[in-house]
Curated annotation (Swiss-Prot):
SUPFAM superfamilies: Aminoacid dehydrogenase-like, N-terminal domain, NAD(P)-binding Rossmann-fold domains
Protein name: Glutamate dehydrogenase 3, mitochondrial
Organism field: Oryza sativa subsp. japonica (Rice)
Alphabetized InterPro entries for the sequence: Aminoacid_DH-like_N_sf, Glu/Leu/Phe/Val/Trp_DH, Glu/Leu/Phe/Val/Trp_DH_C, Glu/Leu/Phe/Val/Trp_DH_dimer, Glu/Leu/Phe/Val_DH_AS, Glu_DH, NAD(P)-bd_dom_sf, NAD_bind_Glu_DH
SMART domains reported in the protein's UniProt record: ELFV_dehydrog
Catalytically driven reaction(s): L-glutamate + NAD(+) + H2O = 2-oxoglutarate + NH4(+) + NADH + H(+); L-glutamate + NADP(+) + H2O = 2-oxoglutarate + NH4(+) + NADPH + H(+)
Amino acid sequence: MNALAATSRNFRQAARLLGLDSKLQKSLLIPLREIKVECTIPKDDGTLATFVGFRVQHDNSRGPMKGGIRYHPEVDPDEVNALAQLMTWKTAVAAVPYGGAKGGIGCTPGELSRSELERLTRVFTQKIHDLIGINTDVPAPDMGTNAQTMAWILDEYSKFHGHSPAVVTGKPIDLGGSLGRDAATGRGVMYATEALLTEYSESISGSTFVIQGLGNVGSWAAKLIHQKGGKIVAVGDVTGAIRNKSGIDIPALLKHRSEGGSLEDFYGAEVMDAAELLVHECDVLVPCALGGVLNRENAAEVKARFIIEGANHPTDTEADEILAKKGVIVLPDIYANSGGVVVSYFEWVQNIQGFMWDEEKVNRELQKYMKNAFQNIKDMCKSQNCNLRMGAFTLGVNRVAKATLLRGWEA
């Protein structure tokens, strides 16, 4: 089952629990707008290259739509649609006043020069500038994009609409970005882990962890969990996987990787089969890489007692059912990795106010939002007698449904 089908299935289950009628369900599921544009740019060698860009704006009942823009060769409308819908529920669960959107361009960033990426970003912005905006749709970085990409979007958008720093988040600090934004998703994963373990009278300190993915989310999650006393016994990325039952020295590993080293030549651990990473012995498994990595092929072999979904849709539907039967507690992506969108909201607020927060305030407010969201999910689980994933979906869908009905959009 692909991400769109799984997200839609979770939505329908939540809608049934809430007793939403079919007309309202249809209204909530169908995107507000799907945009597909052709972006042709001159390459450095003088030839022309054409790329296809997408933006799906799913729902704006609770506020401006919010979601990343990814540059990846496999960007397709179904995936973008699923991720836009997921953002609608994620922002609602986090209690930030946004709806959901997602976008992307089908390209391979590594095959384009910096100047080609800039031209592509500016052309894409020219095509969609009248459909995004501070109070309409606020993009952010995603796979294959970064703060520099957001700076180009901001600059190009401002040519049409005047200086508008709040039109994108995840910007460089010098252009209105927020302190703490770079670490926000990984920090949110750590706060979510803390909340879950506390609920089960456990703590990060003394627990063992396996982390898949050492990109922005995984590396920050690993660093912060390590700082809290968590013992990370195995990690993996696209180059392979390593383990050390006594615990990996995460600061040393991250320094090693920043200097160009690979996992396999890191001195502080032994190489392991990457296929075994997700079923390695641990208390807490934290997948922070791609979707669908936990499936019917490996779910039955998972030894972790808790799974924290740092990635989007890392657990497919069949794996979810297998893990539930095993008694594994899964903290769903729409809550666990929402730290990024929460701090994006803080950045947007700071831009609108023209007042910058210090990093301590950003982190303090993020912790408060993550704790409150977990409590709200728990309350929903209790009232609906459901697991954490369905509790989170039901919480998000309920908030969006209420906003839709209050606006009179149900017809």
